[in-house]
Amino acid sequence: TISKDPDMHGYNIKGIYGMNGSGKSGIVTSVKILKNILTDPGYLNNPIIQKNLDSIINKKTGKLFIESDFLAKYIDATVMCRYKLILSKNVTGKYSIEYEQLSTKKATSKSQNMKIIFEIVNGSIETLNIEDDKLLKDVIEKTRNLLTMESMSSLFYEKFLIPAVKENIIQNKKTMPNEMEKGIYIWLLFFFGGELHVFLDQSDDHREYVAINSLNEYSNGEKKLNPSIVRSLMRDKREYVDVVSVDQNIVSKHEYKDFEKTISKLAEFLRIFKADLKGIEIDKKENHDVWICDLVMNYETYNIHAEYESTGIKKLIQLFVYLREMVKGGIVFIDEFDSNLHDVYLCALLEYLAEYGEGQLCFTTHNVGPMDILKQYNKSIDFLSEDHKIYPWTKRGNYSPSKLYRNGMIEGNPFNIDSIDFIGVFGFDEEDE
């Protein structure tokens, strides 16, 4: 049962464990795709994205199915929403939206059935529940022939919310646009997508590899670079404008002061781990209407470009804004949270986020150290098996989840590998003696 004013503390942190290749990064990647489908109208029309999807989506089925339940508070009501999405290849070989559905109910109701807000099959609107007849007609008309490559929420944002907000600004209105009130559930879906923040470990973020291959296809020999590839790369780069990178941060001039404040806070954060850090300087170069910003670490007797910091410090630089979003109330997914981070630092961060974070954090890891922190909280540990099934940890008397996991006593995670299994693999066996 969900209360009228649910308190997420005690339920706001989750670690996903599993053997190598079990699909942990696949879960986080799916959330990244979900976010982009919900918020970016041009996502599926990006050729780089299409190549990436073709490489990562299940080869046997050729489909990606995502279902997500989320709670949303609107005025005095708490609403449970369920969103379903199926991506599949169309006749042209591109991934498109085969099926999309949003349904809702009062979160506090035990008996109420889910009400379908919209249902779309192969781009055709089967159901659309909007009480205002004019808005209903406009939505049908303005999304016609677009819903196979763009989601309802991203189109609603592009076709209705942006124009309505601009009109309100022109007329100096301070009330919510009518389109937001009349299409509130679609707006809540878009807002949910905006609250998702996903950090993929570099080895699992394949877009750069795909982009380089795509560029090579068009730049080899006498072929000219396809302009659509260039536009797609630029659009993909802008997606990360709010994320702090080690180098070449692209910052619009009107957002530069906010970027300075973020870097100042980043320096405070890093000083916890490196007490001799005096500050971080921004080396900026002008490029039309943006600044290209590198970070220079300032120590008492020398300066060093952030690129030459340790991998652990570089990881903390990248993670900073994601952790900040979780503290402020965002929903954050981090792949391989433990990579390049000391176990002591990781556990301290998790304790802080669980206690003071207003949002939610879900992360994948191989490090069993955090289990002793996580086991104190509800529904905080999931195990992913070799056959991709999820087994939630349930308390078993005084048993420690970390000990059971190490000993291969968690279902689907046998860890039945012994040192003798490596004999001969590296080119040395009994015959070579």
Regions found by a protein language model. Give the residues of each.
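Pre-Walker A-like glycine/lysine-rich segment at the N-terminus of P-loop NTPase domains
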Residues: 1-33
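Conserved ABC ATPase signature
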Residues: 12-21, 289-324, 331, 337-341
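Electropositive, glycine-dotted interaction segments
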Residues: 84-272
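Short alpha-helix of the ABC ATPase nucleotide-binding domain corresponding to the H-loop/switch region
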Residues: 342-347
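C-terminal lobe/lid and adjacent interdomain/linker elements of RecA-like ASCE P-loop ATPase modules
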Residues: 348-433
